Amino acid sequence: MNPNFLEFEQPIADLEAKIEELRLVGSGSDINISEEVAKLQEKSITLTESIFRGLSSWQISQLSRHPKRPYMLDYIKRIFTDFDELHGDRAFSDDPAIIGGMTRLNGQPVMVIGHQKGREVKEKVRRNFGMPKPEGYRKALRLMEMAERFKLPVLTFIDTPGAFPGIDAEERGQSEAIARNLRVMSQLKTPILATVIGEGGSGGALAIGVCDHLQMLEFSTYSVISPEGCASILWRSADKAPEAAQAMGLTAGRLHELGIVDQVIKEPLGGAHRDYDQAADAIRKALAAQLESLCSMETDALINRRYERLMSYGNVVSDPADE
């Protein structure tokens, strides 16, 4: 099976293999097979549309972790210009799992901050598989406070399985670093836009996710724990991950229904990894539209709106018939 395809995409993989086989046959002979290839390509598109219309929460969770899915640096190259990366938390060290710096969106200066996973083995290890340590969150906080001083909007990109749970991270104050970010971001005197581009795992995601506008890519996820972790706690078996994913409501569509997410950004057919440029263009347009609206607001009104937005989470409306 082609490694670019997940298990539930096997019928698509088989069809794409046939198309590739026909192309190889046609390239080595005088037989015109363009019409047959076109028919199979059309069939592949129809099949992909059919499969992706009915994805389960677990299948979407798998897509959010796809090894070929674009990461933050892939989007920075396609969405922004003049990116100048800034390093270090000015207290301990620099954490490569968090990337941040000043850049421009359609010519407007902004501060961009986000998680970065690794693509190859060495890079995965260097970036700790996208799991930040306290110094990563303190670096993010330093850049946010810098953005506030220079009146730059803050754009965050969320893609992490969670904050690093190692002993060294706990010794250096992992929970304190996350909590401080939550507090400061809730009162930051500049617009904050957050985009979930892959996994949004627990406090590790939330530490750069307090915002005025939260948007998610169509096949990204946002949850308090991974489906496997939830299944291990509730059922004592990670095999129950599909059931856990369904119960958790971690998909962009479900979170939008619940009012947690403000906007769902449509991905290219088959997922963002099928077309980096198209996915980046969709994010760029969404960011530009929201940025114009938020930057026009008075600072006090912006912070009050953000506070009310946060306080609206978790409200329970009881049915009078049940009382």
UniProtKB/Swiss-Prot annotation:
Its Gene Ontology cellular component terms are: acetyl-CoA carboxylase complex
Per its record, the protein catalyses: N(6)-carboxybiotinyl-L-lysyl-[protein] + acetyl-CoA = N(6)-biotinyl-L-lysyl-[protein] + malonyl-CoA
Q: What is its EC number?
A: 2.1.3.15
> Where in this chain does the record put each CoA carboxyltransferase C-terminal domain?
32-293
Hey, which pathway is this one from?
Lipid metabolism; malonyl-CoA biosynthesis; malonyl-CoA from acetyl-CoA: step 1/1
GO biological process terms, alphabetically, are: fatty acid biosynthetic process; malonyl-CoA biosynthetic process
Where does the record place it? Cytoplasm
Task: List the protein's name.
Answer: Acetyl-coenzyme A carboxylase carboxyl transferase subunit alpha
Q: What organism, scientifically named, is this protein from?
A: Alcanivorax borkumensis (strain ATCC 700651 / DSM 11573 / NCIMB 13689 / SK2)
